[in-house]
């Protein structure tokens, strides 16, 4: 069940959020049913995006995760309240080794997160859509997977 699966991911991510004082809100649509996917790979993709959102969220900020089905796709939208994507990042963030934030060139960041996420989603026949949220001004990443 997709709602239960996303609840488990929220529980895992919430402990990371608590250490940074960030609230994680999960909203799932009704009657989502089940999804045929590699659950571990999909979890890694979702956690990569949530981790990025955590890194770019302001203190006491909120990360919004919404899950809904439209047409033949499941949409998992992850939106933060940070500064959003630069125009350059919108075009290149899914490329290997791209780092939009040059201050993050530490041993912990290699510019692989969204590249790996995009690769996982493509393996599932899906698409990763990057934009800036009109609601929060922050980054919005939508994972679209065929249902």
Residue ranges and their predicted role:
Residues 1-11, 25:
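A conserved beta-strand-to-alpha-helix junction within the catalytic ATP-binding
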Residues 18, 23-33:
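Conserved catalytic submotifs in the C-terminal HATPase_c
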Residues 53-54:
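Short helix-loop "hinge" at the ATP-lid/N-box region of the Bergerat-fold HATPase_c
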Residues 60-72:
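Short beta-strand/loop element within the Bergerat-fold HATPase_c
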Residues 80:
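Acidic ATP/Mg2+-coordinating residue in the GHKL
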Residues 85-99:
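Short conserved segment of the HATPase_c
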Residues 125-127:
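Conserved glycine-rich
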